[in-house]
Amino acid sequence: MPLALYDTWSRTVRPFTPIRAGQVGMYGCGPTVYDDAHIGNLRTYVFEDLLRRVLERNGYAVRHVVNITDVGHLTSDADEGEDKMEKGSRRTGESAWAIARRYTEAFVRDWHALNLLEPTIWCRATDHIAEQIAFIETLDRAGYVYRTDDGLYFDTSRQDDYGYLARLDRAGLQAGKRVALGGKRSITDFALWKFSPADVQRQMEWDSPWGRGFPGWHIECSAMSAKYLGTLFDIHCGGEDHIAVHHSNEIAQTRAAHGTQLANYWMHGHFLTLDVHTKMSKSSGDFVRLQTLQRRGVDPLAYRYLCLTAHYRSKLHFTWESLDAAQTALNRLRHLYIGWPDGGRVDADFAARFDAEVNEDLNLPRALAVLWDLVRSNLPPATLKATVDSFDMVLGLGLREWRPVAVDVPEHVRALLGERARARAEKDWAQADRIREALSAEGWRVEDTPEGQRLFGMAMGASEPDVPPQ
């Protein structure tokens, strides 16, 4: 079936039609690099990677641009508080520039660990100050800019449909405001350029026609997407937390400057939650980093697999139990895959079923079900491998690259594994769990399979020691 995608602007799933035949321009809002990304952030990038892979499976050449916010993102999205980069500098004692480099490198490591395709272009906000100033000048000439004591602001009252992406009730927001506007005319107006305080030496500041300072958060994406994709491109992605503020403001800027709504399709991923109601976020302190998973012996691709189990527009509830289940499923798939021979052909019927699911707004949970139906089928092993290979071009689980790695297992670990096998045979589940935790504390991961226990080392990936199932 033809590709159809959910568009936040229209609130509908609609057929995908590119601006230029066979080509797609796609922009994703990247991280603010003042700290490590958490796995909730990374879920959004897994969704965007899956989108790109599905587009490429449908024959499109994708020009994929991802920005790095390394200046201008204040601690409050309402243009209040301290620049997150400067705050990170005070927290660590490093310069803001060093903070940006360190966390950009960490983010790119996470990106690669999750087997995300390399963007066509990475673009940093600090490398595009001139473009942002030029964009603000265009807005100023068009009459959308006014000045306050602390900076230049965008006048949202000039656009009757401002906030349509989020279906904002502007009148209700204005009537119910509970904060001082600090010179802003409206609660929805937002900063384009912030002035450096006269008595403060900032680490990140630049000269501009209006005075020394730094750009607001939203202007970077309008300016950089215009440079690399044009003033109207196909798809703009991000987390759903960007809808009400950041993406609404990007649209406002670009419509004022160029008369377009920036992108023809707006796509947003849902939150990862730590419990039924709590969104994972740095500001709340409720978050888990990818490195946390790795230290516990979890392959990052197990987290990618977990992301496949929920539709990108649905909440994904994170638990260690669900992650363990994802690791077990991934390891089972890997061990099956590595035993199949090469030389087969893709099964057309299963491929058609898989494509029908991924082309229906990226329904990866159902596509994953097709994969397991395939694995359980009676098709020849070489056909299974060729077809799973084809699916993995979308799933991105790196099956062809994976290899088990033998490691030495100390005798006392083998003894604990034997004790645990006896405890399970005697249905002493509490003792079996205690031994599992003891092994985990020493850097070993135990999985229970239909064939018995499997022991894995804590090396990245499912490194299997030379211990037979027990």
From Swiss-Prot:
- Report the subcellular localization: Cytoplasm
Record GO biological process: cysteinyl-tRNA aminoacylation
Under the heading SUPFAM superfamilies, the entry gives: Anticodon-binding domain of a subclass of class I aminoacyl-tRNA synthetases, Nucleotidylyl transferase
- Reaction(s) this enzyme catalyzes, per UniProt: tRNA(Cys) + L-cysteine + ATP = L-cysteinyl-tRNA(Cys) + AMP + diphosphate
Q: Where does ATP bind?
A: 282
Q: What class of enzyme is it?
A: ligase
Q: Is Ribonucleoprotein a UniProt keyword of this protein?
A: no
Residue numbers covered by motif 'KMSKS' region = 279-283
Residues at which Zn(2+) binds:
29, 221, 246, 250
- Residue window of motif 'HIGH' region: 31-41
Its Gene Ontology cellular component terms are: cytosol
Superkingdom is Bacteria
Cofactor annotation comment: Binds 1 zinc ion per subunit.
Give the family from UniProt.
Answer: Belongs to the class-I aminoacyl-tRNA synthetase family.
- State the protein's name: Cysteine--tRNA ligase 1
Give the source species: Burkholderia lata (strain ATCC 17760 / DSM 23089 / LMG 22485 / NCIMB 9086 / R18194 / 383)
Q: What is the lineage of its organism?
A: Bacteria, Pseudomonadati, Pseudomonadota, Betaproteobacteria, Burkholderiales
